[in-house]
Amino acid sequence: MTKSLSEQLFETAEGLLPGGVNSPVRAFRAVGGVPRFIDRAEGSRIYDIDGREYIDYVGSWGPMILGHSHPQVVEAIRKAVERGTSYGAPTPGEIALARTIIEAFPSMEMIRMVSSGTEAVMSAIRLARGFTGRDKILKFEGCYHGHGDSLLVKAGSGVATLGIPGSPGVPACLAELTITVPFNSNEAFRKAVDRHGKELACVIVEPVAANMGVVNPRPGFLETLRELTRKAGIVLIFDEVITGFRLAYGGFQKLCRLEPDLTCLGKIIGGGLPVGAFGGKRTIMDFLAPNGPVYQAGTLSGNPLAMSAGLATLETLRSRRDDYAALDRRTADLCAAMGKLFRTAELPVRINRAGSLFTVFFTDSDVFDYETASHCNLERYARFFKGMLDRGVYLAPSAFEAAFVSFAHSDEDLEKTLQACAETIKTLGGNP
């Protein structure tokens, strides 16, 4: 049997790249089969090198809220690249993008550009430690904040996908400085602050967890974090790498009306190009070099291509800020229709949604933290993923990731997705 081009390329890649990929979840280990090698993308669609077309709900893991190859973003990149790819010097674009982000996030008075969400988080934590003079940090089980050493303890995303409790290579002394408590547990958080509060530099949280699948904060949870960190002099960091500009123009903090001390952003603020940023109160940000003693630097920080793509993306989103509600409703309608198909087939699922993000958990129990997420039926999700893929719908190749609906998804796309879902359910033993 003739192998597909994706199969041939993957065999070659396995001899050149660990696991054949440059990020573990792409290897399809959790769902089986061969990863699709993508040739191009436009709007709501991606196309693999074998010529197959898919309705894309991965969206480069979130930033493609406008759809792939958006004309204004592409044009901004084209104009920027004609002027040079990187200077290693300040550019006007840095100021324009910084001002745009700060105007959207009242909690930010200053911002520092970096090259990835991971780098933003690592730098924000270093800054919090330098500002407070404390060493310990607190994170929540199942929340993923990039692959920084201190943050791989009980993490989500690819760590959860591969079933890894942490990661070899992370020194025990670093892990000991990371306190973990269950997401959505006010009681556990209070106990941790009571015990470690005087040693904690920061508390970092995804305000909506999106890397153990989508898990919303319970009422009062984030408010408790804000109250107790403020009382204990602990820096509160919102990791909005996924939720920033995705759930609202101004991030989830605009919706929950809470202001963290620091915010981490990524992905979307570069229009899908490599970028990240962290920002917050001037009193904290002034501790960064060259103003202060906390060192952070990067050759490609604020590079002109990412700044141009990011500014074009955010300007477009700003002009469409009133359209977020409609996008949320369309996503809610899609999730409701999918839920009805599963119920008719008597297949136990929980579909968690936050704005235009959602996750299908194959479980008969509510999912509100990492423990409950980990009880979902991974084998059934893998079969669901493959069935949808075979029918032209590209979902995350992991049960612990989010699906993303974009402004580019049409009514026809959603109808085709539901049809694919109905057909796939039949292969899972259902009869909708």
UniProtKB/Swiss-Prot annotation:
Looking up SUPFAM superfamilies in the UniProt record yields:
PLP-dependent transferases
Question: What are the disulfide bonds?
Answer: none
- Which Pfam families does the record associate with it? Aminotran_3
Q: Which cofactor does it need?
A: pyridoxal 5'-phosphate
Task: Give the catalysed reaction(s), semicolon-separated.
Answer: (S)-4-amino-5-oxopentanoate = 5-aminolevulinate
Q: Which UniProt keywords apply?
A: Cytoplasm, Isomerase, Porphyrin biosynthesis, Pyridoxal phosphate
Q: Name one GO cellular component term.
A: cytoplasm
The EC number on file is 5.4.3.8
What terms describe the molecular function in GO for this protein? glutamate-1-semialdehyde 2,1-aminomutase activity; pyridoxal phosphate binding; transaminase activity
Tell me where it resides.
Cytoplasm
Family label: Belongs to the class-III pyridoxal-phosphate-dependent aminotransferase family. HemL subfamily.
Alphabetized HAMAP family for the sequence: HemL_aminotrans_3
Q: What is this protein called?
A: Glutamate-1-semialdehyde 2,1-aminomutase
Organism of origin is Syntrophus aciditrophicus (strain SB)
